[in-house]
Amino acid sequence: MPPKSSTTKHIFVTGGVASSLGKGLTASSLGMLLKARGLRVVMQKLDPYLNVDPGTMNPFQHGEVFVTNDGAETDLDIGHYERFLDRDLDGSANVTTGQVYSTVIAKERRGEYLGDTVQVIPHITNEIKHRIRRMATDEVDVVITEVGGTVGDIESLPFLETVRQVRHEVGRDNVFVVHISLLPYIGPSGELKTKPTQHSVAALRNIGIQPDAIVLRCDREVPTAIKRKISLMCDVDEAAVVACPDARSIYDIPKVIHTEGLDAYVVRRMDLPFRDVDWTTWDDLLDRVHNPEHEIVMALVGKYIDLPDAYLSVTEALRAGGFANKARVKIKWVTSDDCKTPAGARVQLGDVDAICIPGGFGERGVTGKVGAIQYARENGIPLLGLCLGLQCIVVEAARNLAGVADANSTEFDPATAHPVVSTMAEQLDIVAGEGDMGGTMRLGMYPAKLAEGSIVREVYDGKEYVEERHRHRYEVNNAYRAELEKKAGIVFSGTSPDGKLVEYVEYPRDVHPYLVATQAHPELRSRPTRPHPLFAGLVKAAVERKTSK
């Protein structure tokens, strides 16, 4: 159905009262509903920090770095957008204050402002506006832009001023602002309090933005009287005051906000062409989420487990692997340091059905990851290694099977006598401190050729060539490949098309049912409705192992 007008519509999502309210999930759910109504939707996140991208940020502070097909290192919310929309996004989906200022300062140095005094308004806001409006192509009906931070933060002001200007320039009928606010419950008095939301909306109006809808985040159902009060005090239609209580699964959120009528209100208010929501695919997903036939325990052995967001795409990919097998995947968070010794590994991993070794950087925790791999190999526990996980599998094989006791990676010991994992040639200067760390890894989508008869070729449905997203500086040292295959029995089952870079390793089926690893980050391409084959294969192996006991 063609749009009634050629103007691409803009929906802006802001947050108030507190951070971590789930703006990204709410925006993603709205995007999924609009797509299910036949609209072409793209999404974008505006991040108010001064880093150019999150690539050099501590995972404990920021969570995971989500890499897009074109190699951009972006915010984890971009992962939510891709999973809910089932659409690949690119680097333009994440705009940071650092990117904006870098561009404006570079233009000033080139003399592009012709003597102007460069200021936040109009130069910074114009650059933000350009990055928002360039998403509005002829192939897009709706752009949903999430404004990071909380209304009232100093850092968010240029972005919010830009939202006001966009609304003025493209027309009020073409812009819709959704404000997400916390509705706290005060236990002793037994009341839901509306005052924080009123103050948050007042702060937004002070900047010149009147929200068109308010989403109330709370831990319980919201009475109609509370909605009416917020509608009156915040000057929003009662139909546009939407309650979004905590859900059992994040994949329930689209149904929640659809039941509250947000998507219907948006399409009518913006005069968008629409059809009824097609729930076919999503209902099948929810059936798999809530009515599993199996349950398995999956150990995620990592070094950043105090902040689960550091492994967000991995955990979602593991759960999606469960959906593919009608299984519920319970994540057991295991600190890698607890697996340093065989006894420690046995305590942590003795009761699990499968293990995932995710990526990471630096020496801390690596000994434990190697210990976990040894335990899985010796006890036939299905294991999937990702990026650093692959490198640790190669190190473990060299040390314990090939007789190279001091085998290591140059990342952990630059002077190691046996660098079975080494720095990629083009990364040597950067590792030596002679280049920028940010945005310089092997990033983005790269192809691989899979060996005939291998487990990975089988799980990829027999495909000879596959593509995955990458983020690494180190690779398996080709000088040790023949020795490791001969002495350790490990199979290098996938390489770059020229055969020079190891992309997949595994053990033969008669040695281990499923000990597989990839240098890539396949979790970044997993979707709840289209689980990634490597994760589906891992869960399948775990279910088979558990049911055969």
UniProtKB/Swiss-Prot annotation:
Q: How does its activity get regulated?
A: Allosterically activated by GTP, when glutamine is the substrate; GTP has no effect on the reaction when ammonia is the substrate. The allosteric effector GTP functions by stabilizing the protein conformation that binds the tetrahedral intermediate(s) formed during glutamine hydrolysis. Inhibited by the product CTP, via allosteric rather than competitive inhibition.
Pathway where this protein functions: Pyrimidine metabolism; CTP biosynthesis via de novo pathway; CTP from UDP: step 2/2
Start and end residues of each stretch annotated as Amidoligase domain: 1-272
Q: Which GO BP terms apply?
A: 'de novo' CTP biosynthetic process; CTP biosynthetic process; pyrimidine nucleobase biosynthetic process
**Reaction(s) catalysed by this chain's protein:** UTP + L-glutamine + ATP + H2O = CTP + L-glutamate + ADP + phosphate + 2 H(+); L-glutamine + H2O = L-glutamate + NH4(+); UTP + NH4(+) + ATP = CTP + ADP + phosphate + 2 H(+)
> So where does UTP get bound?
S19, K193, T194, K195, P196, T197, Q198, K229
Q: What is its EC number?
A: 6.3.4.2
Q: Residues that bind ATP, according to the entry?
A: S20, L21, G22, K23, G24, L25, D77
- Please provide, alphabetically and separated by semicolons, the GO molecular function terms listed in this UniProt record: ATP binding; CTP synthase activity; glutaminase activity; identical protein binding; metal ion binding
Record keywords: Methyltransferase included?
no
Q: Kindly name one Pfam family recorded for this protein.
A: CTP_synth_N
Q: Where does CTP bind?
A: S19, D153, I154, E155, K193, T194, K195, P196, T197, Q198, K229
Q: How does it assemble?
A: Homotetramer.
Q: What else is known?
A: CTPSs have evolved a hybrid strategy for distinguishing between UTP and CTP. The overlapping regions of the product feedback inhibitory and substrate sites recognize a common feature in both compounds, the triphosphate moiety. To differentiate isosteric substrate and product pyrimidine rings, an additional pocket far from the expected kinase/ligase catalytic site, specifically recognizes the cytosine and ribose portions of the product inhibitor.
Family affiliation: Belongs to the CTP synthase family.
Free-text function comment from the UniProt entry? Catalyzes the ATP-dependent amination of UTP to CTP with either L-glutamine or ammonia as the source of nitrogen. Regulates intracellular CTP levels through interactions with the four ribonucleotide triphosphates.
Q: What is this protein called?
A: CTP synthase
Which species expresses this protein natively? Answer: Streptomyces coelicolor (strain ATCC BAA-471 / A3(2) / M145)
What is this organism's lineage?
Bacteria, Bacillati, Actinomycetota, Actinomycetes, Kitasatosporales
What is the gene called? pyrG
